[in-house]
């Protein structure tokens, strides 16, 4: 087991795929958790903080995938929530509802943090939630009339989508705050570490 402090965005960027194992629970963060994260990000911007600690992420290389595919053992709620926030920013830009100062921000977010760059034309998403959440997450990439509104995935995505439009901070500032999220990245080494015992 190896642990090191690093930025969450480095963790996301260096992974081709982040798989939530079938034995994990469904995504269950409530809106209050998203409000807290959003408030922390805004405070990071306003206080000009160098970083904001965001907890630990425990992962192990996926034996069924490439060396850059990881099973997320602990931290799936945080990874999923940040992915929803990033997708909300990207979709707001795509929908023309916000205009970033950086004209490349949409591509930076989608290609580095949301989509597997090796297969961008096939739109292979980096995050692979468990089956109960996968459909709701996939629908967020398409027509809003097809969203699964009963899913927490969708509800929290919509919270971010709407909140960003109400704030007086720019999406560039918000993305910069996301880049300041610091994690403890704990990587398990099989067979010594059993992911199901963590």
Predicted regions and their residues:
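Glycine- and hydrophobic-rich flexible loops that cap the catalytic core of alpha/beta enzyme folds
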Residues: 1-197
């Amino acid at each position: 087991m190896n642990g090191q402090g690093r930025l969450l965005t480095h963790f996301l960027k260096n992974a081709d795929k982040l798989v939530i194992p079938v034995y994990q629970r469904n995504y269950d963060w409530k809106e209050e958790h998203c409000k807290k994260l959003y408030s922390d990000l805004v405070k990071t911007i306003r206080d000009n903080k160098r970083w904001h600690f965001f907890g630990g992420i425990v992962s192990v290389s996926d034996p069924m995938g490439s060396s850059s595919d990881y099973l997320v053992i602990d931290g799936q709620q945080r990874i999923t929530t940040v992915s929803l926030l990033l997708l909300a920013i990207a979709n707001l830009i795509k929908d023309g509802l916000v205009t970033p100062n950086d004209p490349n921000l949409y591509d930076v977010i989608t290609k580095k943090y949301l989509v597997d760059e090796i297969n961008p034309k096939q739109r292979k998403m980096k995050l692979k939630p468990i089956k109960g959440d996968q459909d709701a997450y996939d629908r967020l990439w398409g027509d809003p009339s097809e969203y699964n509104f009963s899913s927490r995935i969708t509800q929290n995505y919509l919270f971010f989508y709407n909140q960003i439009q109400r704030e007086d901070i720019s999406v560039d500032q918000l993305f910069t705050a996301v880049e300041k999220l610091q994690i403890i990245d704990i990587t398990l080494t099989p067979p010594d570490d059993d992911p199901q015992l963590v």
